[in-house]
Amino acid sequence: MATKRLARQLGLIRRKSIAPANGNLGRSKSKQLFDYLIVIDFESTCWNDGKHHHSQEIIEFPAVLLNTSTGQIDSEFQAYVQPQEHPILSEFCMELTGIKQAQVDEGVPLKICLSQFCKWIHKIQQQKNIIFATGISEPSASEVKLCAFVTWSDWDLGVCLEYECKRKQLLKPVFLNSWIDLRATYKLFYRRKPKGLSGALQEVGIEFSGREHSGLDDSRNTALLAWKMIRDGCVMKITRSLNKVPTKKNFSILARNLNTIQVEEMSACNISIQGPSIYNKEPKNIINPHEKVQMKSICANSPIKAQQDQLQVKNNIKASLHNVKSSLPLFNTKSSTSVGQLQSPTLNSPIYMQKQGKNEHLAFNTKSKASTVGSELVLVSTTVPTVHHVSDLEMSSTLDCLPVLADWEDVVLLPASQPEENVDCTVPISDSDLEISFNSGERLMVLKELEMSSHENFGDIEETPQKSETSKSIVYKSPHTTIYNVKEAKDPGSDISAFKLPEHKSSTFNRVNANMSHPLVLGKHPLLSGGTKRNPCSPQAFPPAKKQPFTIHEEKPTSSDCSPVRSSSWRRLPSILTSTVNLQEPWKSGKMTPPLCKCGRRSKRLVVSNNGPNHGKVFYCCPIGKYQENRKCCGYFKWEQTLQKERANSMVPSHSTGGLTFSSPETSHICDRNLSISTKNSLRLRPSMRN
C-alpha cells in the first residue's frame, strides 16, 4: 500500500476516475468562459474502394447542448441530409455509420438543413438567453450567457462543412466560424495523444455509450468527455476561427500594405507626369481625358509629401491643373492627344512648344477633345507641361524672334497613324537622320542653334546641328535664330522638301513614332491660316526649344551622281519600316510574353498573394501543376524582374547593319546613299521567334 501511495504521489499511477451512473454529478473546479457548449459531430459520405474522393457530403447533422455548470444535455438536434453529388451511399458508408439509403433519401438538402439548424439555435437563444462570442478571455458577469461550438477535431467545421458550402455556394452561418477542438484541448491538458474518441473516453474512465460513428451518439459522448475535462479543471477556450483577423491587430501587415500602396501611387504619379504614353508610340494609344484628370488627382492627393513637393517644384502640376483656363487664356485649343504624346516630341521637334513670355509658364491642357482634318491629318494642341527652368539664352532668343515669329500657329497638323496608299510621301529611316519628302512651292528654313539644358525627366542630349547647303537669302537674323527664304527652281526632276531631325541618342525614352515626330511636314497643306505673312503685333506663342537644334531646308540635286527624284516615283515604304513599334521594352506596357519553360511549354504568369517580402511580385513558372497526374513539372521558376534584366542584356546587336537603297524605274539611285539601319533602330523579334 505504501508503494502504491508513493507511486500516486510521484504521478507514476493515478487514481481511476469512475464516472457516475447519470454522468452529471460533480461540479466544475474552475470558472468556465462559456456557460453552454454545443457539440457537433457530422457523418459524411465515405468509400473504401481505394480511390481518392475529393468531395464528401454531410449525411447526418447532429448537435447537443451541454450545460457547463451542471453537465446536463439540455437540448438535441438531429437531421439526415440528402447528398446531391453522390446520392447513392456506398456499402462501406452504410456499414460504418449505420445510416440506411432510405434515411438519406427521405432527408433534406444541406441548405434546408442549415435553415432548420438556425431555427433550433434561435430557439435555444431565446430560451437560455445565450449569445455566441469569439475571443473571450474572461468569464462573463452579465445576465447574457456565452456559448461556443465543440467538435472532436477541426474536420467537421473546418473542412467538411466549409468546403461543401463553397462547392454548393451556400451561405454558412457566421457563428459556425469559431469552435473548440476538443482533441487538441485534450492533448494539451492531459499531455498525451488520444487514440480516437473512444480511446480518449477509456483513458479518463468513461465507457462509450451507443453506436460508434453514429452522429448523435458521437456528439453525446463528446459532450461527456468535455464535461469530464471541465470537472478536472480544464478551461474551454476557442482554438480555431475562420474569421479574418482585424487589420488593427496586425500592424506589420498594415504597414506593408500601406508601403505597397504608396509605391504604387508614386509610380502612378511618375508615369502620369512624365508621359503615360511615352512608351506607347502609336497614335492610337490615346488616353481618355477624364482618365487623365483622374490620374492627376491621384498624384495631387498622394500621401507622399516629399514626392508631391518635388513634383510641384519641377513641373507645378497641381497649379496647372486648377488654373489652366484662368492663368493661361491663350491655350484654349482642345485635343485628345495624351500628355505623354505632347511631351515626347519635345525631344525631336520644337514646334510642340510655344513661347509665351519671359516669366510666363506653360501648362497642361487637360480638358481636350479630338478633331480631325481630312483623313490623313490630325489637329492637336501644342500645349505641353510646365517648364520652370528656362535659361537666359533661351529668353533672349525669345525676345529676338518676337517680331518675326509672333503669329506662329497655336495648333499643328500631324499625319495620321498610317497614311493611305496614295499619299505622296516617303519616310526613309537612316542611322543619322529621318527624312520626309513632300511637294512644296516655297518654304521657310529655320535654323535654330539653342543649347540643350539638362533636365531630370528627359536626360542630357547633345546634338550637332546640321548645316544647310541650299541657296538662300537671309530674311531675319538674331544671335541664335536665322530665318532664310528659300526659293526653289521649278525643276521637273525635283519637287521635294525634306524635314531633317538629328538622331535621338537618349536611351531614357523610346523613339517617338515616325508619323508623330514630324508635325511640320504637311505636303501641300499650308501651316499658316493666313499665308506666309505674319502680324508682328500679335502675341508671341512659340516656346523655347528645349531640345537639340534642327534644320528645315530645301534639298536640290547638287551632285552629278545624284539622280533627280520625283515625289510621284517614290513608293510608300512598308509599314514595318515606317513605324517604330515599341519592341525595345515590351514589359513597359504590362504585356510581356511569358518565356518558355524547360519542358517547351509557355510558362504561366503568377503573382505572389501571401503577405511577405515578395507580396505582389510577378513570377513565371511551369504551367503543369505539381499534383497533375501523368504529367511532370519541369520546375521552371523565374521572377519577372530578373527576366526583364536578362532580356535587356540580351538586346545586343543581333541584326547586321546592311545598306538599303530605295529606287524606282524613273530614278537610278539617291545620291548613292544606302540607308543603314543600326541595331538600335532595327526591329526586334518576339523572344519565341529569335534565333
Swiss-Prot record:
The record's annotation in SMART domains points to:
EXOIII
Q: Does the keyword Nuclease apply?
A: yes
Q: What does the entry list as the binding residues for AMP?
A: E43, H213
Citing just one GO molecular function, the answer is:
3'-5'-RNA exonuclease activity
Cofactor detail note: Binds 2 magnesium ions per subunit.
The record places the active site at E43 (proton acceptor), H213 (proton acceptor)
Stated EC number for the protein is 3.1.-.-
Sequence positions that bind Zn(2+) = C597, C599, C622, C634
Kindly give the InterPro entries that the UniProt entry links to this protein.
Answer: 3-5_Exoribonuclease, ERI-1_3'hExo-like, Exonuclease_RNaseT/DNA_pol3, RNaseH-like_sf, RNaseH_sf, Znf_GRF
| Signal peptide (from-to) | none
Note the zinc finger regions (GRF-type) by start and end residue. Answer: 597-643
Known outcome of mutating I206T:
In a colorectal cancer sample; somatic mutation
Ordered alphabetically, the record's keywords are: Exonuclease, Hydrolase, Magnesium, Metal-binding, Nuclease, Zinc, Zinc-finger
Q: Where is each Exonuclease domain found?
A: 37-226
Residues holding Mg(2+) 1: D41, E43, D218
The organism sits in which domain of life? Eukaryota
Give the binding site residues for Mg(2+) 2.
D41, D156
Names of the cofactor(s): Mg(2+)
Give the family from UniProt: Belongs to the ERI2 family.
The protein here is known as ERI1 exoribonuclease 2
This chain's source organism reads Homo sapiens (Human)
